[in-house]
């Protein structure tokens, strides 16, 4: 098996994880050359208890004027208490092209660091992304 070829694409938006004493913090990073008008992050999910599923609604966050290279905190996960939860993040990102709507896959315990959108317009692995012009 040959080694994987180096990635020729550049991420525009990605998630970066930073471990602190009490939690794993997750940041949305603007890797473009432009200031984003706004980045809105929405957390959803659920936990099962016996035969019931209980929905989870996290804080909805909105950041304005997110500069190139800047990361904004979108979530924090507790490595012990959050293990039984299934989380999913969605984003609305306003930029010069229009508004991107981005949805991560649902994951148990936390959301992993990952590329959300590449410079060729393709979404990251297991990510849904669509652009609304305007």
Please place each PLM-identified region on the residue numbering.
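Short, well-ordered beta-strand segments enriched in hydrophobic/aromatic residues
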Residues: 24-30
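Beta-sheet-dominated interaction scaffolds and their linkers
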Residues: 2-23
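Short acidic, flexible loop segments centered on an aromatic residue
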Residues: 33-53
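A short beta-strand motif that forms part of the nucleic acid-binding face
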Residues: 43, 78, 104-106
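Beta-strand-rich extracellular modules
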Residues: 92-94
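Acidic, serine/threonine- and proline-rich intrinsically disordered appendage/tail regions
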Residues: 2-8, 98-134
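Intrinsically disordered, low-complexity Pro/Gly/Ser/Thr-rich segments with frequent PxxP/GP/PP motifs
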Residues: 48-84, 88, 97
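Exposed beta-strand and adjacent loop surfaces of beta-rich binding modules
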Residues: 23, 36-38, 86
């Amino acid at each position: 098996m040959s080694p994987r070829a180096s990635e020729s694409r550049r991420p525009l938006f990605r998630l970066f994880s930073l471990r602190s004493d009490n939690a794993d913090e997750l940041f949305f990073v603007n890797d473009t050359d432009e200031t984003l008008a706004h980045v809105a992050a929405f957390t959803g999910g659920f936990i099962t208890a016996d035969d019931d599923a209980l929905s989870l609604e996290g804080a909805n966050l909105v950041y304005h004027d997110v500069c190139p290279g800047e990361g904004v905190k979108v979530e924090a996960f507790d490595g012990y208490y959050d293990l039984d939860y299934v989380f999913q993040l969605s984003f609305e990102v306003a930029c010069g092209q229009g508004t991107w709507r981005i949805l991560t896959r649902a994951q148990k315990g936390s959301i992993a660091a990952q590329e959300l959108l590449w410079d060729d317009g393709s979404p990251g692995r297991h990510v849904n992304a669509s652009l609304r012009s305007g």
